[in-house]
Amino acid sequence: MTKKKAFTPLLYLASIVFLPWWISLSLNKSLESWVTNWWNTRQSETFLNDIQEKSILEKFIELEELFLLDEMIKECPETHLQKLRMGIHKETIQLIKMYNEDPIHTILHFSTNIICFVILSGYSILGNEELLILNSWIQQFLYNLSDTIKAFSILLLTDLCIGFHSPHGWELMIGSVYKDFGFAHNDQIISGLVSTFPVILDTILKYWIFRYLNRVSPSLVVIYHSMND
């Protein structure tokens, strides 16, 4: 019975780790064809930003010029003019579908992440007992560590997350999350987040050390500051 009680939280922890990946993969496969079909056939308008509109217009003009040049070389007016119009029409549809891939991926990834969040939230509420057991294990593990090990762990974690060498790691992480939600890569937004988010984390950490650790373990704070200096 004791082994079963110990095994259940571990099984729950493993499911928490692998469940998001499985849900995301399943939803992406099941929703992709539906979202693509809905966007390409049901939308009355095509949503393009200024950069996309300019780019697609340039490609359309280039395509039209190539078709016209081809027809001038062939010199067969009526039949080939009709084929020209059909060819331009088909290529225009392909161009629009190509530029619609970005919003399709944005909708797909954003919807998938929202559904994953809702499912995991419900799963966490249902597994409240297992979470309490895991939390007690973590607290017991941390309690058994010496103050020196705790201070070293905090220092290592803070240097990794908000140290002078961390911006590149934050850039990769934020870019990955940004891409996971289906948004197009934007250097300005990512740079803005990289320059502000670690600062906010640093402030929260210092406040936590000042308010919580000073009260719970003053010796740990002294060791931490000594190692940090």
From Swiss-Prot:
Matches recorded under PANTHER family: CHLOROPLAST ENVELOPE MEMBRANE PROTEIN, CHLOROPLAST ENVELOPE MEMBRANE PROTEIN-RELATED
GO BP term (any one): potassium ion transport
Naturally occurring in which organism (per UniProt): Vitis vinifera
Record-linked Pfam families: CemA
Family membership noted in the UniProt record: Belongs to the CemA family.
Residue ranges of the TM segments: 7-27, 114-134, 154-174, 189-209
One Gene Ontology molecular-function label: proton transmembrane transporter activity
Disulfide topology: none
Cited function: Contributes to K(+)/H(+) antiport activity by supporting proton efflux to control proton extrusion and homeostasis in chloroplasts in a light-dependent manner to modulate photosynthesis. Prevents excessive induction of non-photochemical quenching (NPQ) under continuous-light conditions. Indirectly promotes efficient inorganic carbon uptake into chloroplasts.
UniProt superkingdom: Eukaryota
Annotated compartments: Plastid, Chloroplast inner membrane
Name this polypeptide is given: Potassium/proton antiporter CemA
Gene coding for it: cemA
This protein's UniProt keywords: Antiport, Chloroplast, Hydrogen ion transport, Ion transport, Membrane, Plastid, Plastid inner membrane, Potassium, Potassium transport, Transmembrane, Transmembrane helix, Transport
GO CC terms: chloroplast inner membrane
